[in-house]
Amino acid sequence: MYRNSVIRSAALAFAISLSLGAPSAFAADQATASASTTAVQRKAVAQGLYELAFSPKQNAVFVASSGGFGDAAGPSQVLRLNPDTLAVETAIPLERKAFGVVLDDANNRLYVGNTVDTSVTVVDTATNKSVGIVQLMEKKVGKDGKAAYTHDLRELVVDGANNRLYVTGHSGEGSVLFVVDTQSLKVINTIPGLGNAKAPGLALDAKAKRVYTSNLLAEVVTVGTDSGKVEQRFKVSAEQPMNIALDPAGKRLFVTDQGSEMIRKYQASSSGFESKHPGQRVLVLDRTTGKELASIPTDAGPLGILLDAQRKRLYVTNRDGGTVTAYNSDTYKQVATYAVPTHPNSLALDAKKNVLYVTVKNGDSEPKGSEESVARIAL
């Protein structure tokens, strides 16, 4: 078991930024696919870009911009982009910094995670206005006498048909799942038991009434949405399980196993820890048993993951490799690589037109305060 302080330190970077990674000597075999830029267009739009969503109903891409940090920080906002040109059509101002997003397209709602404020901002995608803030928890006074939030946020998933929003709350003292009623915009449950570590991954199977999370104790934890409690917990071979994609037609979970040297160094300082896999892969699991079905090599620093089940395609952002890699989700063979340097972060798909959208973070060499990009990949 890793010490709590180790996990908190190792996970601090992505707890704030929704992204992390460090260069690694381990890389995927690129024999089956070469890097391509011909299908990629990109546009710098704002500082501090994070997650994004495509709305078929509004025919728009919505992207969260935190504005960054420090004296050069810009405004926090959600940007509505033209899906063909990536031009900013509308800037929706927010009171709090924007990081994660999830879209309930049928109900014209975009839910935006305010990571550092442990809250969610609700945006009306039809009117392009913020319509509310859900405070998930209040600050508590610590041993130092200062008031602070005990949990921060990362991923959000929504069950629009049942009026429920699920949000992971990170803490080395015990991560939780917040449950929000999307009609009243009230927290109706806070489910403990996600592990005494950061819990970066989150996926919903509304039909099966299950939420799946991952944590940095190398676990996948299943929560029942009806029972409101942890139903299953599996130890997995992924030492740094990050984002999760769920196969809606089968029993599979796809989990990015990042292989960050930064996290590994912290893990190595923990009593009894011995690294057994370099990561840099997607782990395929049977979500009913936790059994490992496959291990798919990726480029360096895999983070975001998206499954297009209809076309049998799996897409992964490789944050340190500067690429998005595509795989056949049945054979697990790599079929394409798209160069999107410096740090591709999050993914969204226009399933009808078969177009992928990617947020791209700046690297250390870019000027401080420079705008970050959204890439459009015609698949």
Name each region found by the language model:
Residues 2-5, 19-379:
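Predominantly soluble domains enriched in secretory-pathway, periplasmic, or organellar proteins
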